[in-house]
Regions:
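Hydrophobic mid-bilayer segments of alpha-helices in multi-pass membrane transport proteins
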Residues: 8-26, 46-64, 78-91, 144, ...
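Helix-loop-helix module between adjacent transmembrane segments
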Residues: 90-96, 116-117, 128-140, 172-181, ...
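Transmembrane helical segments that form the transport core of multi-pass membrane transport proteins
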Residues: 65-68, 72-73, 99-100, 252-356
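Transmembrane alpha-helix boundary signature
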Residues: 59-74, 89-108, 131-143, 310-318
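Interfacial loop-to-helix junctions that mark the boundaries of transmembrane helices
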Residues: 1-8, 40-47, 68-83, 199-209, ...
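Juxtamembrane and boundary regions of transmembrane helices in multi-pass small-molecule transporters
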Residues: 2, 6-33, 164, 168, ...
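Flexible interhelical linker loops that connect adjacent transmembrane helices
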Residues: 36-38, 224-248, 284-292
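Hydrophobic transmembrane alpha-helices that form the pore/transport pathway of multi-pass ion
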Residues: 120-176, 190, 346-364, 386-409, ...
């Protein structure tokens, strides 16, 4: 493990950025107390800003310590396809026609179940939607599930305890629910092509296990809070979802499918996105405000993580090489909590000669730990951004999120490791 000054300083900056993500509530408190600099403290309290801010610090260091050419070459050498993809797919999937389509699906399935409708809606939102993420991508599923939870439950004054328990299950289920296909989950997307993982492989190795875990997590949470859920006044919105014509919904779904199909080709999916913006403008009466700001913040978060993560290979790769498959599974869960799981699996894919058992352990560990922190899984900032306004002082406690994600993570461990 040979490290030069750039490696060491970059890792120090990365550690500071991670600590910053756990301190955003402190900055929000300062913002509420400050009269003259509340805007600045609010900025530092935005978890989506953290990695972009410290990526700027790293860039300034590279410029000062090396030179302009070195800093620019480093930035241009990184791959920003995933941040751009997440931004685009978030905006499209959160558009009103697609949201109405998925909401209508949830309502229909919930109504078909022979139980209280509010309870079944809660259960289906936390089970079906995360599994749907295997087909519409995890960022899209996170956006839809978070919007549904906010509208149907978080905005109805549920307890803080239920809020944290729900977001803990949501983050874990989204992370593991996208493993039925090789393109939906960012940590799998990073390795599927190189390791030749196709749809069949994903179903056989990951899909059935993740389905069991997702359903168990959603079921246990629903049973735990069923009394509180039943007290929520649930409004039937099945007619609301039919406002947009089927043709408009179909075109939105085609745009989403096109973006997913060309997920590796930035020029194409950005072009499709521009056409999508034009279409929503032409048929504005069927649209609501697009989720541009929130999506940009999430994309900025991920881009900053890419810049900072690119300098962590010097310690992460030798660490992975020193572990056996059993240790790497639990090690990946732990490392995922402090690093993006897609970055972790990508670095693992750079190591040659890995056994199939090692590959499974690395990816399974990465998705298992994807709900423990906001930075653990690429779609998490999307859910955080949508739901944080419902929490006290507009911030989500990283510690309480971590604690509430542990039970669901343990269920995922049982399914991925022992089934």
């Amino acid at each position: 493990m040979n490290a030069d000054a750039v490696n060491i300083v970059s890792t120090v900056i990365f550690v500071i950025a991670v600590l910053h993500t756990f301190s955003t509530k402190y900055f929000e408190d300062l913002a509420n107390k400050s009269n003259h600099h509340s805007g600045f403290w609010h900025l530092l309290g935005e978890v989506e800003i953290v990695f972009g801010l410290w990526a700027l610090v790293l860039t300034c260091f590279l410029y000062a310590y090396k030179d302009k050419s070195f800093a620019v070459q480093y930035l241009e050498a990184q791959n920003y396809t995933e941040p751009a993809f997440v931004f685009v797919v978030m905006v499209i999937s959160a558009s009103k026609p697609i949201f109405d389509f998925c909401l209508n699906m949830v309502i229909r399935i919930s109504s078909a179940l022979p139980f209280d409708k509010t309870v079944t809606t809660f259960f289906v939102t936390l089970s079906l939607v995360p599994l749907l993420g295997s087909f519409i991508t995890e960022p899209a599923a996170m956006t839809l599930a978070a919007l549904m939870l906010k509208k149907n439950f978080y905005d109805k004054g549920i307890s803080s305890k239920m809020m944290y328990a729900t977001i803990g299950v949501l983050f874990v289920n989204i992370s593991i629910g996208g493993t039925l296909t090789p393109y939906a989950a960012p940590p799998i997307l990073m390795v599927a092509a190189k390791w030749n993982w196709d749809f069949i492989h994903m179903i056989q190795s990951f899909g059935w296990r993740s389905t069991i875990a997702v359903i168990l997590n959603a079921l246990m949470l629903t049973l735990l809070f069923r009394s509180e859920i039943k007290q929520i006044k649930f409004q039937d919105e099945s007619t609301h979802s039919q406002i947009a014509p089927q043709s408009v919904i179909g075109i939105h779904l085609l745009f989403l499918a096109g973006v997913v199909f060309f997920a590796h080709h930035t020029v194409i999916f950005v072009g499709l996105f521009l056409f999508f913006i034009g279409f929503t403008t032409a048929y504005g009466k069927y649209q609501s405000k697009l989720l541009i700001r929130e999506s940009l913040l999430v994309g900025f978060f991920l881009a900053g993580l890419v810049v900072l993560g690119g300098q962590q290979k010097w310690w992460l790769e030798p660490l992975l090489k020193s572990l056996n498959p059993d240790v790497v599974y639990y090690g990946a869960i732990a490392l995922t909590a402090i690093t993006d799981n897609a970055a972790l699996t990508y670095l693992g894919s750079l190591v040659e000669g890995l056994s199939e058992e090692f590959k499974y352990a690395l990816v399974a560990g990465a998705v298992t730990g994807g709900g423990l922190t906001v930075i653990a899984n690429a779609p998490n900032p999307a859910g955080y951004s949508i739901l944080k306004g419902s929490f006290k002082e507009g911030a989500i406690s990283p510690l309480l999120l971590f604690i509430n994600a542990i039970p669901s993570t343990l269920i995922a461990i049982i399914c991925f490791k022992f089934l």
